[in-house]
Amino acid sequence: MPRRRVAAKREILPDPKFGSKKLAKFINHVMESGKKSVAERIVYGALDIVSNKAKKEPIETFELALENIQPLVEVKSRRVGGATYQVPVEVRPSRQMALSMRWLVEYSRKRGEKSMAARLAAEMLEAAEGRGAAVKKREDVHRMAEANKAFSHYRF
């Protein structure tokens, strides 16, 4: 535990185009080397592609995709008497959001489409439909937690 006070959470400003705080946070996750304007171009480009393909509000598709990626439980390593157990723990809401954004960006980067905007749009559309690599990651995490349910009494 830190000896000092915990740093206060900074208020994040909503993004200029859609007025969404979640989207502003996501733009920050996409950003590399402090290049925010490039990240904004990528995310807004992806949302344009999503609106053309899905014929729905892009922000709704984005939020549905994040919701489908959010993990409810995860495993944490805990040492007990020389043995390390994978203990399932519930994921707090702020971490759920952070993990879902991180996984969406991570698996978008691994895709084969030409531009990052196209990759992000494709992964977002798949996640909104409940498939895709990011959703598979969540299912794998849930499966790990289910397999190690026997160790859930080793709470943190």
From Swiss-Prot:
GO terms for cellular component: small ribosomal subunit. InterPro entries: Ribosomal_uS7, Ribosomal_uS7_bac/org-type, Ribosomal_uS7_dom, Ribosomal_uS7_dom_sf. One of its GO terms (biological process) is translation. GO terms for molecular function: rRNA binding; structural constituent of ribosome; tRNA binding. One of the primary rRNA binding proteins, it binds directly to 16S rRNA where it nucleates assembly of the head domain of the 30S subunit. Is located at the subunit interface close to the decoding center, probably blocks exit of the E-site tRNA. Belongs to the universal ribosomal protein uS7 family. This is Small ribosomal subunit protein uS7. It comes from Hahella chejuensis (strain KCTC 2396).
